[in-house]
Amino acid sequence: MEYQEKIQLQLEESQSKLQKQDKNNEICNAEVDKLVRFVNASSCIPFANSPGIYKIQVSGVDFFDVLCDSQLAGPGWVVIQQRVGGKKRFNRDWATYREGFGSMDSDFFLGLEKIFRLSNSRRHELYVHLVELNGTIYYARYDDFKISDENNGYALSLGGFMGNVSDAMRISENLKFITFDRGDDKRCADHYKSGWWYKSCYNCNLNAVYGTNFNWYLILF
């Protein structure tokens, strides 16, 4: 009887160890899957539950840093432009707008080439989020945002609109991006000290000189 009890106890201990090992294996496999998703990330979706700065890669460009946001419009968005303090000048030349500039903890622009690659990797939605200093929030959503390649001037395409402001960016649809050193025949970029998709010098221009009444963000999903 004592022998049987001893064997039974050993059996139960072995089963307990196996169960713990299985649990550890499950945790390990989950961590491996998570790391694989992170390593192969081409958007902010894998980082939906932990927003911050991560490296992603899309076809045509090397790995690059993106700011992933999950607060403004839901989880998994890529911030492509941020104006939160007016510390960075947006009156930049074509090459700088192509590559991107600024700091992701302050004002920045991701870069036209990266935005082109991202927006053409699959269908993307653009969300424009504006916050007045009194806390009032305004937004605009475009359900099929993309820009063309550099040879075609990074021309703008928006898709359908929804928001609690007017469809102010529509005037820029199908237009090429303009900077003070490229395409600025009407001197709009020079006058407003910023690159943008100008039709005339009166535009919805989210790269214009920073005003103290709003902070704003452009994000892609």
Predicted regions and their residues:
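Assembly "stalks" and propeptides
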Residues: 1-74, 135
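Short, flexible beta-strand-to-coil junctions
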Residues: 59-60, 82-85, 130-135
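Calcium-regulated, polybasic anionic-phospholipid
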Residues: 64-99
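Extracellular/mature segments of secreted proteins
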Residues: 35-36, 52, 75-80, 195-199, ...
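Short, surface-exposed beta-edge/turn micro-motifs
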Residues: 51, 63-65, 74-77, 123-125, ...
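Beta-strand cores of modular interaction/reader domains in eukaryotic scaffold and signaling proteins
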Residues: 53-57, 67-69, 78-81, 109, ...
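Beta-rich ligand-binding surfaces for carbohydrates and other polyanions
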Residues: 95-221
